Amino acid sequence: ALDATVHGTKAKLETHPGNHRIGFWVNAADFVQWKFNFPRAGNYDVELTYSAAGPSGTKAVITLAGQSLPVTLKTTGSWYRYTTLPVGRIKIPKTGPHVITVKCTKKIGGAVMNLKAVTLRPR
């Protein structure tokens, strides 16, 4: 979360010791981006680490390299209880800079999520 660029009116970076996250994401139009320099092309497994105290069913999408991975969030029961959700696989066609974007596509309840990380693991 520390390296993210937050776009919008409500979502913001929260920096608590040992718990950096994008919080106050109550406006569904807000979104988060990371610029990342990929050292190698290939397939990457994508994971989302988040918390959500509200009801399940909020939908988001992770976009990268012209590809989109939809995700449906489940409640974690607390804003301080995080879970890591496998989202899918992305193919990075070439090395170099890319932008990872996380957007809400349907908000259920009062907030989208607390977003801690998007992790990409080479396959």
Regions found by a protein language model. Name each.
Residues 1-123:
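Extracytoplasmic
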